[in-house]
């Protein structure tokens, strides 16, 4: 059976920057309060860009980086909790924009774990079918579902998209996964839909319930536990010592979560790649944006061992062990 490798990456973030100082003018907060509790200095916010546009731009970059044609793609999976439409799917819209006429396309919703879930689904589909190449995208427009009057959430989130191309290969590549869900604790991180009554009565109003709501303490506790469990499980499956692992690329939610996880694993914080100071929490986009940034910066070399790990709403979690092949 063929192995599956990452052969290209891409990303897109909006140009508009919202700083901590700006947020201090609209809610009761400060740059010092946000920095010390989250590690975030600024985040990117879309104005004209929607989820489809950002996903498409990241896809174009990944295709170019992989040195393939869009027609080579057999599968497109988009992980997002902020689609522009219920239908067509974001993946089908990306297919149209890039001309990937041969690809099977669908979206998944697993919040901040979405990119990891997408990788696992794609690997399974490639290994067990005639399909050879897949495009996995994490894309989010979180600024549209943030309550800008809630200082506990509006300081955390940003917009962006990241993508990776997977291909069958004879080389080592994506080796192992560990993933799971805990719906029993789903109420700790929620975002409702816009409720409609399907009535012609002009006096009926839509109830706006589509803001992110979060129990920060419970999510922090879950995140540290899920990260630790996932990394340890992947170590057990691969027999990797953490000293062999060049980087751990985690979901970029909060620097304190990463620091606590590093302590529990008895490893240095610098092993965890972080860029949340620039982008904040971009949910499903955070891991692929970081992966592309590292690829562009030349931080990853062929045969480097890396671990991806995510956690998020659902509640969900997941991780992957990868031998880098670019």
Curated annotation (Swiss-Prot):
The active site is at 112, 251, 281. The keyword Transcription regulation does not apply. It is found in: Cytoplasm. It is an enzyme of class 2 (transferase). The keyword Transferase applies. It catalyses: malonyl-[ACP] + acetyl-CoA + H(+) = 3-oxobutanoyl-[ACP] + CO2 + CoA. Keywords: Acyltransferase, Cytoplasm, Fatty acid biosynthesis, Fatty acid metabolism, Lipid biosynthesis, Lipid metabolism, Multifunctional enzyme, Transferase. InterPro entries: ACP_syn_III_C, ACP_syn_III_N, FabH, Thiolase-like. Transmembrane segments: none annotated. One of its GO terms (biological process) is secondary metabolite biosynthetic process. GO terms for molecular function: 3-oxoacyl-[acyl-carrier-protein] synthase activity; beta-ketoacyl-acyl-carrier-protein synthase III activity. It comes from the Bacteria. Pathway: Lipid metabolism; fatty acid biosynthesis. One of its GO terms (cellular component) is cytoplasm. Its EC number is 2.3.1.180. Residues 252-256 are annotated as: ACP-binding. Pfam families: ACP_syn_III (PF08545), ACP_syn_III_C (PF08541). Homodimer. Catalyzes the condensation reaction of fatty acid synthesis by the addition to an acyl acceptor of two carbons from malonyl-ACP. Catalyzes the first condensation reaction which initiates fatty acid synthesis and may therefore play a role in governing the total rate of fatty acid production. Possesses both acetoacetyl-ACP synthase and acetyl transacylase activities. Its substrate specificity determines the biosynthesis of branched-chain and/or straight-chain of fatty acids. Belongs to the thiolase-like superfamily. FabH family. The last Arg residue of the ACP-binding site is essential for the weak association between ACP/AcpP and FabH. This is Beta-ketoacyl-[acyl-carrier-protein] synthase III. The lineage of its organism: Bacteria, Bacillati, Bacillota, Clostridia, Eubacteriales. The gene is fabH.
